Amino acid sequence: MNKLDKGKLIRIELTEDNLDDYIGYFNLIKESMPNPDFLMNISKPYLIEMLRKNSHIYAYIYDGLIVSSAMILPCDKNAVRLSGLDLDYHEVLEYGPQFVHPDYRGNKLQYFMIDDLRYVALDLGFKYAIGVIDKDNEYSNANAEKYGKLIKTIEEDGRIQNVYFNDLLYGIET
């Protein structure tokens, strides 16, 4: 693990014009995972479609290298319904995939990103967050339990998923 100074991280929001490096980074992450099936395959057209649907993709840069990334996805009515929560879906975001470069794992970057993006999400008008994580993805579930409450487990597309909830106004314990 390479140590880093989180104070030197630069957060950038990706646009349609700067997705190529992110796709290479995503493929590196997927190849380095013990179970790459936790991640779907992505393409530039898919990411462009997400951005056009008001999703936000953030990369965290350290010494010119993407070391971590996260997505903020607007929830739809169905996602909020599946959660079992009685919330206005316009106020709910879904945390999309969060990745950490293999050389920088162990620096608590996933936790750092969630706390950092909480302020971004509040500025975008969101009040609540939902995270859906494959039940077998132990590392991501352990991180999610630090910033959210496990509210239910569902079966979606033949996979067992844990659903976490976070009230963005109150943040997370650090």
Describe the residue ranges of each PLM region.
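A short helix-loop-beta-strand connector motif used in the catalytic cores of GNAT acetyltransferases and
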Residues: 47-59, 68, 94
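C-terminal "cap" of GNAT-fold acetyltransferases
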Residues: 155-174
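Conserved acetyl-CoA-binding loop-helix of GNAT-fold acetyltransferases
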Residues: 97-100, 106-119, 142, 146
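Conserved active-site alpha-helix within GNAT-family acetyltransferase domains
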Residues: 123, 134-154
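A short, internal acetyl-CoA/4′-phosphopantetheine-binding micro-motif in the GNAT/acyltransferase core
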Residues: 87-88, 95-106, 133-134
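Conserved acyl-donor/pantetheine-binding loop and adjacent beta-alpha core of acyl/acetyltransferases
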Residues: 68-97
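Glycine-rich acetyl-CoA-binding "A-motif" of GNAT/NAT acetyltransferases
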Residues: 65-68, 139
